[in-house]
From Swiss-Prot:
Gene symbol of the encoding locus: PGRP-SB1
Species this protein is from: Drosophila melanogaster
Protein name per Swiss-Prot or TrEMBL: Peptidoglycan-recognition protein SB1
Span of the signal peptide: 1-24
InterPro entries in the cross-refs: Amidase/PGRP_sf (IPR036505), Amidase_domain (IPR002502), Peptidoglycan_recognition (IPR017331), PGRP (IPR015510), PGRP_domain_met/bac (IPR006619)
Keywords attached to this entry: Disulfide bond, Glycoprotein, Hydrolase, Immunity, Innate immunity, Metal-binding, Secreted, Signal, Zinc
UniProt record similarity statement: Belongs to the N-acetylmuramoyl-L-alanine amidase 2 family.
CDD domains: PGRP (cd06583)
Organism placement in taxonomy: Eukaryota, Metazoa, Ecdysozoa, Arthropoda, Hexapoda
Induction: Strongly up-regulated by PGN from B.subtilis. Weakly or not expressed in normal conditions. Regulated by the imd/Relish pathway.
Amino acid sequence: MNTSTAISFVAALVLCCLALSANALQIEPRSSWGAVSARSPSRISGAVDYVIIHHSDNPNGCSTSEQCKRMIKNIQSDHKGRRNFSDIGYNFIVAGDGKVYEGRGFGLQGSHSPNYNRKSIGIVFIGNFERSAPSAQMLQNAKDLIELAKQRGYLKDNYTLFGHRQTKATSCPGDALYNEIKTWPHWRQN
């Protein structure tokens, strides 16, 4: 086997593994955490340009499905009540129980980053990530979710990744998580 063929083979193998990884991602539906129906969901047509990463700023995060579902339900209650959003603000929630939960989901406008809501997918990590980064599993789940969004046509191949602090004056998604996402291939300085 010549060098060119070997490189092509390795590249194909890597792409195959990435595709399998994203296809293996299980997204827990809204019904799994007892979501209340959205008041007036707004559809987004076509692929969006941005992924915005957040943290929920819960000091202890969650590690069991019961804890995570309760926290997600509380976030939705806060967003619909105190903040008067039509639904939970995020499109997806990455939780410490090793799962990804559907917030608003794909193809719906979030309420997580003013000026970017109509052109982004908002992903929140449950926990406070000022001093320590999320687990390797949480980080991989977010990467797999982003890959899945691209594969399904909800996210452009040349998307830009931002931390919430790049779209609004806030410390979100925490220094440790922000420093982590700055190493991801689509992160850009704005």
